[in-house]
Swiss-Prot record:
GO cellular component: cytosolic small ribosomal subunit
Gene that encodes the chain: rpsO
GO biological process terms on file: translation
Name of this chain's protein: Small ribosomal subunit protein uS15
Source organism: Kocuria rhizophila (strain ATCC 9341 / DSM 348 / NBRC 103217 / DC2201)
GO terms of molecular function: rRNA binding; structural constituent of ribosome
Family named by the database record: Belongs to the universal ribosomal protein uS15 family.
Record's subunit section: Part of the 30S ribosomal subunit. Forms a bridge to the 50S subunit in the 70S ribosome, contacting the 23S rRNA.
Keyword Manganese tagged: no
Keyword Ligase among UniProt keywords: no
Pfam families: Ribosomal_S15 (PF00312)
């Protein structure tokens, strides 16, 4: 399930560290978090959609690795992002 371009652009502008920033860990993690929440809602209605469940697990793993990278490189940015996204940590 792809994100709508308008929603993705809104997330990018909200979490970007500078103009045109699409690759910073904050932006990537925010986009992944939105995709994860959308897929989670989809799976609540379609419990037997195992292909989507596998894709969701891959996205969760990718977000976990990005969060680990951010925690290793800049703990302050990591804590701010966790707080902002409302992720448990």
């Amino acid at each position: 399930m792809a994100l709508d371009a308008a929603i993705k652009n809104q997330i990018i502008t909200e979490y970007a560290t500078h103009e045109g920033d699409t690759g910073s860990p904050e932006v990537q993690i925010a986009v992944l978090s939105r995709r994860i929440s959308d897929l989670t809602e989809h799976l609540k209605m379609h419990k037997h959609d195992h292909h989507t469940r596998r894709g969701l697990m891959a996205l969760v793993g990718r977000r976990r690795r990005m969060l680990d990278y951010l925690r290793r490189t800049d703990i302050a940015r990591y804590r701010a992002l966790i707080e902002r996204l409302g992720l448990r940590k």
